[in-house]
């Protein structure tokens, strides 16, 4: 689970923060200080309730990231003028906090591709910045926390080429690795 330790969230020129994977709320707490509106989703009811209590002005949803993200994106919750910083961290639901298996198999195990497809569908002209953690489950490389060759998503990051221009995508090898997609200058 990434924590965006090496990121200055306020430096991206965004006014809205959306994360998938609330966890203990550490990253939400960091964002809560800098954004007009914050959104977070998790499948763990206890973690959601704790985040709602800690950050009463944030909108915290309970459910699978794809479902809640689509609800927010399709509802008119965000205008095209909004600049959103997305932090996509909902893979391996239940594994970090409730002992579920770390696996890349199953519909909800690694929702990154679907999450990015939803963002592209509902915000085709959005001037957003997207950070996705755990790049090391999509590729091998000089990751600070090492590689996980036994836990690789089939096809890796090939799906990105159909969603975003190559020049907007970069890989950061800090910690478990981050995929960064910069659409602010689209």
Residue map of PLM features:
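Residue-level preference for short coil/turn positions at secondary-structure junctions
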Residues: 12-13, 34, 80-82, 126
């Amino acid at each position: 689970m990434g924590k965006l330790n090496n990121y200055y969230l306020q430096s991206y020129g965004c006014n809205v923060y959306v994360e998938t994977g609330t966890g203990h709320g550490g990253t939400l707490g960091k964002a809560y200080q800098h954004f007009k509106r914050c959104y977070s989703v998790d499948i763990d009811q206890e973690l959601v309730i704790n985040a709602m209590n800690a950050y009463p002005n944030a909108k915290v949803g309970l459910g699978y990231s794809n479902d809640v993200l689509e609800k927010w994106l399709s509802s008119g919750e965000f205008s095209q003028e909004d600049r959103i910083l997305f932090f996509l961290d909902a893979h391996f639901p239940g594994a970090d906090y409730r002992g579920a298996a770390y696996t890349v198999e199953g519909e909800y195990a690694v929702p990154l591709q679907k999450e990015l497809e939803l963002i592209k569908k509902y915000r085709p002209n959005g001037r957003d910045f997207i950070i996705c953690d755990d790049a090391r489950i999509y590729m091998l490389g000089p990751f600070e926390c090492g590689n996980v060759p036994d836990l690789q998503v089939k096809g890796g990051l090939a799906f990105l080429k159909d969603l975003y221009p190559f020049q907007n995508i970069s890989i950061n090898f800090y910690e478990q690795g981050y995929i960064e997609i910069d659409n602010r200058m689209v």
